[in-house]
Structure formats: structure tokens, C-alpha cells
Amino acid sequence: MGKTTVTLTLLASLRRRDRLVQSFKVGPDYIDPMFHQHVTGRPCRNLDPVLTSETYVQQCFARHSQLTEYSLVEGVMGLFDGISSLVISPLSFAEDKGLMTNDKGQITDFASTAHIARLLDLPVVLVIDCSRLSGSVAAIAHGYQSFDPRIKIAGVVLNRVGSDRHLSLLKDALKPLQLPILGVLRRQDNITIPDRHLGLVPTAELPELNALIDRLADLGDTCFDWQNLLPLLKSQPLPHPPNPPHSPSSIRIAVARDRAFNFYYQDNLDLLQQLGAELVFWSPLEAAAIPKDVQGMYFGGGFPEVFAQQLAENTSVRDGVKTAILEGMPAIAECGGLMYLCEQIIDFEGKSWAMTGVLPTSAVMGARLTLGYRRAVALQDNLLVKAGTTVHGHEFHRSHLTLTPTKPLFETSRYDCDENMGCEGWGFPANVHASYVHLHWGRSVEIPQQFLKECRTYK
């Protein structure tokens, strides 16, 4: 059990108590929010100041936390792990900015859980893996407690505790810190969430998930100090801009959503609807044809390599997608969606599976993980942005393309430095935006506006 499982235990127990809870996830992750939504019944919202902005993070949290009695944010990595955490230089605390900086003025924990906690003025519950600790637990807790005095460590959850004797040693060690113990989770070898090459297996592929959530709720009912924990989770009234009005639906967008394609930010889908799009969800795995009377297509990321055979065997859909795009229908394809538009996917075993063939290249699975935030500059006018426009996104994949386009969409670099990552992305045909870079449109509402403008032109 790790941070995500502890979070799910909290959410499951709250829902068993019939409490409405809104969950959030720090960072760009897609899969953890799927688990949150499965438990709470509400879309989880990502809080990522790199993909969006600090202001957007504040407004997103304020807007959605007001809708429920309780709010819970799951962090990312360690508390202070941000995109510039590897900068080695003296640290100082810039009280006027509320950010931790080095002697170059760089924020050293930007986009970390600590950064979000400061930005939203939220208390932090520290989850400590105690499986190989006794007295050292106090040193760890004290280190986190004192590292940045602006972070409010409200208490600790002791995770993977062994015997009663082990728990006694941990409690004795923590007494001098006067830090509340808000939960104790014993070692649970029978509670595991399967994972694979890109992290946890998504919820749609776990038939036993409901039984697992029930076990987590049982655990949560007894392992947490709810009397002291519930006040920390209570949603507080926060000022935020009014919800934008929905434009009348004037266009239909086919959104591929099934076991193969399920990496979407709910905020992106909401934006499309607010701008007047009717979203038609469909399955390239199961459907007999693409949806009728649509003026655009949106293929998110996911795991087409896992379902490559089933995608390949659905020839009517493959042919329909290719025909529609070649006839001019605008299409966004991110990562897994990009792979689906290729001629073929070559899986981890070297087997080749035919895809739609819109793009004259193949996606080859491999061991190398490409991961990180990207700054991407558009090299030409394309479906979504004008030449010279800079967008911020992230990559997370274990595939590569056999052919680089002669006129790529973007020149990319790492977000936290000037290291050039090369050119990527297909914008040919001109009505296609196919890229490994995942985008959150909270930073640039102009992107979905431009997409829908092109869809209306096609209509």
C-alpha cells in the first residue's frame, strides 16, 4: 500500500458514510484520477501549475471544492519533489512570493505537493512508510515538519505498520514532536492494485475493483482518527469566478473512450461542452462504425498497444476513421491516439498490428520510458495553434515512431531547462493534430476554440 491506496481508503470510507467528497490530484497523471472517480462518483480534477497556471489551480480548486462537503488532494511523489528539485544550490525562502528558491531565484519545488499546499493554504497529512522504521520515523517527520515552516503538517498516517510492538515504538518516537497520529494502516499483503509498463492498470480493466474498494472502506472505518481528520477535510468557502455559461450545442465531437483510449482531463471535456460542443463518446474497440453526424474526432491517450489486436480486427472502424479524416474531418490525437492513426503498432513482442493508416509511420513499443514536462513551440500553423505559439504539456510513453514528419508540429524542450528534445508531431493532413505531447487546455482556452472553429468549417 502506498500514497494512492491510502487516498483511496480515505475516499472509500467517506463514501460509505454517504459523504460527498471532491478529489484532486497534483500533477499530470491520468490513472490515479480514474480510481478517485470510481470511488467518489465525481470526476477528479488535476492541479498542475505547469500545464495550466497557479491562478488556474486556485480557481479550479475553489470552484469544485465548493460543490461537496469534503475535499481531498492526493499529492505527487514526495512532498517537496517539484520540477526543479534537482537544482543543487543554497536554498532561501522568498516570503513575498511564498515559494522556495535557490540563489538564482529559481523555484526549487515548483509544481510539487508542497507548492500546491502553499498555493491553496491547505494542511498536509504526511503518509510515512514505516515498514523498516522505528525511532527513525521521528527524524523523518521532524525533517518534513521543519524543512519549510510555511507548510502546515497537520498529522501523520503511519503506513505498513507491523506488530503492536512496532506501533508502540513508532508512537514513542513521535511523542516529542506532538504531531497527531491521524491513522495507522497495518501491512496488508492482500490489498494490491495491479500495475504494468505505465503505472497502475486503469479501472476499466479491473473486474474485481469494487470488491477491493469495499475492503479499503472496511479498513478505513477502523484505521483513521476520524474525529481529528474530518475537520481537516472540510471544504471551505473560497472566492472564485462564476462558472462560465454553456454555449448552445452546435457541433458534435466523437470522443473515443474505452479501455484503449481513456486519458482525458475532465477540464478539457468540460471546456468543449462550455464552448458549444456535444460530446459523443464511443469505442473504437466495440463500435461497428464511427458515430454519425459528427464534425470532429478526439482520440486521447491510453493503451492501444494492449488492445492492438482488437483494434486491428475492427476493420470497419479503422477504415471509417481514415476515410473521415482524409475527407477533411478535424481530429486531435494525443499519444495513444497518435499511435492509432499510424499504419501499425509493433507491440513488445515484435508483433505488428494494422491501425488506421492515416499517418505514414509506425509506432514501436520499447523499454525506454519517455517522461517529463515539455515546452513546445509550434513550427507552423496547425489545427490548434499558430506558428510560433508556445504550449506546455507532458509526455509519458514507451513507444517511438519509425518516421519523423518532414514538417513536424513542434520543436520541444524540457520545461525546466533549455535542453532540446527534438521535433515531433504530425500536422499532415492539415486537419490533424497528432502528437505525443498531452495538453491541458486550462492554460489556453484558445486551443479548443480553434478546434471547434475548424469543426464548424467542416460542418
What role is predicted for each listed range?
Residues 1, 5-85, 105-119, 128-152, ...:
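ATP-dependent carboxylate-amine ligase catalytic core
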Residues 25-26, 181-189, 278-286:
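Beta-strand->loop->alpha-helix junctions that form or flank phosphate-binding loops
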Residues 65, 84-108, 236-250, 456-459:
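Intrinsic disorder/low-complexity segments
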Residues 134-240:
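Internal gly/pro-rich beta-alpha loop/helix module
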Residues 251-326:
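Phosphate-binding active sites in nucleotide-utilizing proteins
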Residues 304-382:
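Cysteine-nucleophile active-site neighborhood
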